[in-house]
């Protein structure tokens, strides 16, 4: 009954609503809106034309680590932070003056074997111990050394240091494990030799630096297959020495406790004579630009590698060279990529970097282009280097591109401060390159203080566009005529530096 009454009342109310509106008549017509001026519709993509302005400049205050030398010669670099985790790493310094020149890849293979068991935790027992700690080891080998790193909670500092010392000092080097690891390593290296860009850089560095310095860090398949467990043991006993190593610790720790634990776990690392240091190989003398060509029949693209030598990391003027190369080819907005990608549309990307090692440096440019644009791309790269370096060039470096490079380098340094493992990685440079403790703290200020005219002088002094090493992997029949038309001698490559035969499959 109540529902029917409510329904009736609602119907009556709705029926009465129209009577509330004012009645329309001829004397009271409906009011029309006043006309408005014509306005052109907004371009929905106009905002893309407005380049965003840079944000606030990042301030950088990179802390200076402490250095303690143990009696056995081990250097301890430590940096306390408020981070919730610890980053610990052992760095073994090695180079062509210690390692045998006729055994490329031996140092990397030795490092790979470190985590396959120790004398205290053989085989899978080491993996179980690491898993119990809730972490894992990372091992990385470069041209200057090997880094063995681990992350742990501050409460696990003692256990983490114990495992790190075991891996670095007491590897088991089981013959059974060696056979498996070497087979996997060779397969990975062979796979990398199927990558045109990897091949072009290997060929280029061999020609630029010679067999010793220029050999690939991970070795050649044929050479790796010749190595035995005895080679690994010999390499470890002559290179993994406390006087040739550093321990880096970054995170939340008590300095007194850390020193005591380091002495406990690393103090027994015996100091002994290592391998005699050989004379540093002389770099091949480059007198003119030359092209090395590896045939990859019917390849739709050419992998291009262009390089020439620069001073080593520890040589004076590192900040100038780093800023110069970053401005030239280190960014998407750098002139090299803007030319080859944005202007010419030859490639998806062309970049250059400064490879700065303990004994040498190199400007290395890498890109891949459509086969028909190979010679054009080489010509543009050489022209860009000429415009950068030649005196009275019509296209010298300008403030905008240098400022972008400055900001990128400084911001990347700032990013390091948020991660203990990145700070630890930065500390590696201090030991490997014999740099002062405040080097990282000063680097940002040095980058910011380099005047434009000084950077232009650096380009003229160090960039030599007439003595380039150019390595190309591509369809030789298609690209050879264009390369010869550039006026450079073209040398066919069929083998790598150790005699490794190169038979690239047709596409």
Where on the chain are the PLM-derived regions?
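M16/insulysin-pitrilysin zinc metalloprotease superfamily fold
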Residues: 21, 116-120, 150-182, 331, ...
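M16/MPP (pitrilysin/insulinase) zinc-metallopeptidase core fold and M16-derived inactive scaffolds
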Residues: 89-154, 194, 215-218, 331-346, ...
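An aromatic/glycine/proline-enriched structural segment found at the starts
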Residues: 35-51, 217, 246-312, 472-507
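Bacterial N-terminal signal peptides
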Residues: 8-19
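Short acidic/His-enriched helical or mixed secondary-structure segments at domain edges of catalytic enzymes
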Residues: 184-203, 282-301, 338-347, 358, ...
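Non-catalytic, conformational "gating/processing" segments within enzyme and secreted inhibitor domains
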Residues: 201-202, 212, 229-265, 466-468
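Histidine-acidic residue clusters that define the catalytic metal-binding segment
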Residues: 43-68, 206-245, 277-282, 312-314, ...
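Acidic/histidine-enriched segments that form metal/cofactor-coordinating
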Residues: 27-28, 32-46, 126-235, 284, ...
């Amino acid at each position: 009954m109540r529902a029917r009454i409510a329904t009736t009342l609602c119907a009556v109310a709705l029926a009465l609503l129209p009577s509330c509106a004012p009645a329309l008549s001829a004397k009271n017509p409906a009011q029309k809106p006043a006309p408005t001026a014509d306005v052109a519709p907004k371009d929905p993509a106009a905002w893309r034309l407005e380049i965003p302005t840079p944000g606030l400049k990042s301030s950088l205050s990179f802390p200076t680590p402490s250095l303690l030398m143990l009696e056995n010669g081990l250097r301890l670099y430590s940096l306390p932070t408020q981070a919730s985790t610890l980053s610990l790493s052992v760095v073994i310094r090695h180079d062509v003056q210690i390692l045998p020149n006729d055994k490329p890849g031996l140092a990397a293979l030795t490092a790979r074997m470190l985590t396959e068991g120790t004398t205290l935790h053989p085989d899978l027992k080491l993996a179980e111990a690491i898993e119990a700690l809730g972490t894992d080891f990372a091992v990385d080998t470069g041209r200057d050394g090997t880094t063995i790193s681990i992350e742990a909670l501050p409460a696990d500092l003692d256990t983490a240091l114990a495992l790190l010392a075991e891996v670095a000092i007491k590897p088991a080097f089981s013959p059974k494990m060696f056979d498996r690891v070497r087979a996997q390593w060779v397969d990975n290296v062979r796979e990398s030799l199927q990558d045109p860009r990897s091949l072009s850089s290997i060929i280029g560095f061999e020609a630029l630096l010679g067999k010793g310095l220029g050999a690939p860090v991970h070795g050649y398949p044929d050479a790796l297959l010749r190595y035995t467990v005895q080679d690994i043991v010999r390499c470890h006993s002559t290179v993994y020495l406390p006087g040739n190593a550093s321990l880096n610790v970054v995170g939340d720790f008590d300095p007194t406790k850390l020193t005591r634990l380091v002495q406990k776990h690393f103090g027994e690392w015996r100091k002994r004579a290592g391998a005699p240091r050989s004379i540093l190989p002389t770099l091949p003398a480059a007198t003119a630009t030359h092209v090395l060509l590896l045939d990859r029949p019917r390849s739709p693209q050419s992998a291009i590698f262009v390089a020439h030598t620069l001073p080593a990391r520890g040589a004076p003027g590192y900040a100038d060279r780093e800023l110069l190369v970053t401005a030239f080819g280190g960014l998407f907005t750098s002139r090299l990529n803007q030319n080859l990608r944005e202007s010419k549309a030859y490639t998806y990307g062309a970049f250059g970097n400064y490879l700065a090692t303990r004994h040498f440096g190199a400007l290395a440019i890498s890109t891949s282009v459509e086969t028909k644009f190979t010679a054009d791309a080489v010509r543009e790269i050489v022209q860009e280097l000429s415009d950068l370096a030649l005196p009275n060039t019509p296209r010298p470096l300008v403030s905008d591109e240098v400022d972008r490079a400055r900001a990128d380098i400084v911001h990347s340094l700032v990013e390091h401060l948020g991660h203990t493992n990145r700070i630890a990685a930065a500390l590696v440079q201090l030991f490997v390159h014999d740099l002062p403790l405040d080097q990282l703290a000063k680097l940002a200020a040095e980058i910011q203080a380099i005047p434009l005219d000084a950077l232009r002088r650096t380009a003229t002094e160090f960039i030599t566009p007439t003595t380039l090493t150019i390595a190309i992997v591509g369809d030789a029949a298609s690209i050879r005529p264009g390369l010869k038309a550039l006026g450079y001698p073209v040398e066919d490559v069929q083998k790598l530096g150790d005699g490794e035969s190169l038979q690239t499959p047709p596409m």
